[in-house]
Amino acid sequence: MSTAKKELFSERVKAGSRTYFFDVKEAATGAKYLVINESKKVGESHEHNRIMIFEEDIPSFSEGLQKVVGFIQK
C-alpha cells in the first residue's frame, strides 16, 4: 500500500524573518489534512516547526483560531 501524500493546495505567507506554509494534503486513504509549517532564520541556519490538523479537527481548530485572532485584534 502506498503512503504517498498528494498536495491539494498551498499558501505561503512571509512575515518578517519567518515564512509560514499552509498546505492541504491528501493521504493515500483519501483523508485530507492541513499542515502548517513555520520556517525561521536563526543565525546562518533555519529553524522549522510543523503542526498537522486532521480533517475531522478543522472545525474546532478554526473556531479556536478565530477566537484567538479576535482577542488579539481588540
Region locations from a protein language model:
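Positively charged, low-complexity terminal tracts
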Residues: M1-K74
